[in-house]
Structures are given as C-alpha cells and as structure tokens.
C-alpha cells in the first residue's frame, strides 16, 4: 500500500472537517477525491502531506507512520496545494532550482530542464512567475511537485484556472505520471475524475 488513512478526524474549533475517515491507495493508482467545497478534501491532503499535524487517527505512507517519520515521508511526496504558493518575483527556472535545493536533488539543472519541458513551460520560461497567467502558474506548481521525482503525488484542485487546451495537456501529464506513481487529486468536478482517474 502507498497511502493508508484509518479513523482520521480533524476539527477546527467546534467545526468538524473530517469525522473518522479512512481509505487506501495502491501504488500506481490515480485516485480522485471528489466532493463539494468545504467537504474536507484539502484538509485530508494537508494531513497526508504532513502540513497539518493536529489530527486524530493514523496515517501510513509506504508502510511508515506519518507521526514517526514526517521528514522521510515529505521527501517522497510531491504536493500541489489548492493555493499554489509561488514566488512572484522569481523566474520559473530560478524557482524550480530553489525547490531542487530544498529536496537535495542530484543533477538539479538537468532535472529542472526536463520538468520544464514535461510541463510545457518553455514558451514562458523568460518570465517571472508573477507575470504568468493562472494556467501557467498552475503548471509551475505542478513542476515543483514533480521536480524531485516523488513516489506519491498529491494534487489539490490541479485543474483550476486552466483553459481547455491546458486542461487536456495537464490531464495527459497526470495520466502519464500515474503509470509510475500513486496520484491523489481533489476536485469538485465529476468530469475531471472520469477523465483522469482509474
């Protein structure tokens, strides 16, 4: 198993975001996390990625307990949060090289060049992130989630702001990625799940 959640609950004050949820993801599976806004999708993803530690229940990633091995687990997860935290004053390549340093990626220039090509960022490569369209900012977010070649990819609303052509390209990229990695993506759009997930 790649990802296992058992009896996971999370509250924000008196508001329950998650109430005793559980699921399992197999290696090489693309799974859609479907639900309306406010259903707890982002909270679940923040827990899986180690961004939220204040929860009840158990989370195991690649047979490691998240509470006992948070740094090892973070190293094997690529995460695109719903609010893509980019640095608007950095150039695309500069930002991605920064991410490779955080993950201690070997051959960073080669990895960045490959992910720029894979995510279709070449046409905008000379721009700062703050100058990019919403769709290209999403691509940069996806590139940063993939640049360290993670085993598990967590994508929170990855299709937000994409035009129809970009949607098709990103769907294809996620499907290709899912052949070798475990992918969990959240959305509130059923067609996205049908188009991408196993």
What name fits each language-model region?
Residues 3, 10-198:
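ABC transporter nucleotide-binding domains
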